[in-house]
């Protein structure tokens, strides 16, 4: 029996992890969400799968994360095998701004600064808080793996190749997350804990009215560097690939920043 805890589990990639893992009745799956009543599909899934447990945990709150870890410990007997840190601050008001858009524009600068602070809290500090809350359980687990969701937009070489100019707070904060993962790996290697950062690829998680145009735009950008790029993955396909990659990684791979395919091909 393998136990998993997934943050940001109410929708998108996080929910896809829960659906995938719940299919194996020998798994014990913990879905961590900010609001336990925010996702009817998750509630329905938990109702039909006794191995799924929904827990409240805002990843910016160390207190809520500690409480969630305590709840997990009560069910598993003090252990956790795999932690997937998926929750993130993705798209703020400044997502469309380039850095040069801020020049001479105090209002945009203020909005950008706020988004960057939210990204620090939601993407960087959240990883520290989440990892620290569950680390005692992970150390006692059998698998001892932590997967932190990153993005190809955190790779400077890729950003230069793609000529990507916007959503700076997200990409910059995820680049910092990759460093946090590397530092954790250095500290945990002697404990046999494998912690890695994986990009899920371009995944079709947005369903708003603007989403189709956004995915078409991004797909065209990526095809300039990789003409064979087929477009966004479904959350289910991305999760399948990431779990396959995670299963192959060992403590010797700790601290690495890889794609869903286990390499540096972000597309």
Locations of regions flagged by a protein language model:
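Conserved glycine-rich Rossmann-like NAD(P)H-binding loop of the short-chain dehydrogenase/reductase
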Residues: 22-40
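C-terminal helical subdomain
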Residues: 197, 212-267
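Structural signature of the Rossmann-like NAD(P)-dependent dehydrogenase/reductase core
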Residues: 6-7, 85-86, 145-151, 194-199
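Catalytic loop of short-chain dehydrogenase/reductase
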Residues: 89-135, 139-190, 202-205, 209-212
């Amino acid at each position: 029996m393998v136990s998993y805890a997934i943050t940001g589990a109410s929708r998108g990639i996080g929910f896809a992890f829960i659906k995938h893992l719940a299919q194996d009745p020998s798994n014990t799956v913990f879905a961590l969400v900010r609001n336990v009543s925010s996702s009817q599909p998750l509630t329905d899934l938990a109702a039909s799968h006794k191995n799924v447990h929904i827990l409240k945990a805002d990843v910016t709150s160390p207190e809520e994360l500690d409480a969630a870890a305590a709840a997990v410990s009560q069910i598993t007997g003090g252990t956790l095998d795999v932690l997937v840190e998926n929750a993130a601050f993705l798209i703020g008001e400044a997502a469309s701004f380039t850095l040069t858009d801020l020049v001479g524009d105090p209002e945009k600068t203020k909005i950008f600064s706020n988004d960057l602070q939210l990204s620090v809290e939601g993407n960087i500090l959240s990883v520290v808080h989440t990892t620290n809350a569950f680390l005692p359980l992970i150390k006692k687990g059998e698998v001892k793996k932590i997967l932190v969701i990153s993005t190809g937009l955190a790779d400077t070489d890729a950003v230069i190749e793609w000529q990507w100019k916007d959503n700076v707070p997200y990409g910059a904060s995820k680049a910092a997350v990759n460093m946090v993962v590397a530092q954790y790996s250095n500290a945990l290697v002697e404990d046999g804990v494998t912690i890695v950062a994986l990009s899920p690829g371009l995944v079709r998680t947005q369903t708003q009215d603007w989403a189709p145009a956004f995915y078409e735009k991004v797909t065209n950008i990526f095809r300039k560097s990789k003409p064979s790029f087929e477009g966004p993955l479904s959350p289910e396909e991305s999760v399948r690939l990431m779990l396959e990659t995670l299963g192959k990684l060992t403590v010797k791979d700790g601290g690495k920043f890889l794609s869903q395919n286990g390499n540096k091909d972000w597309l």
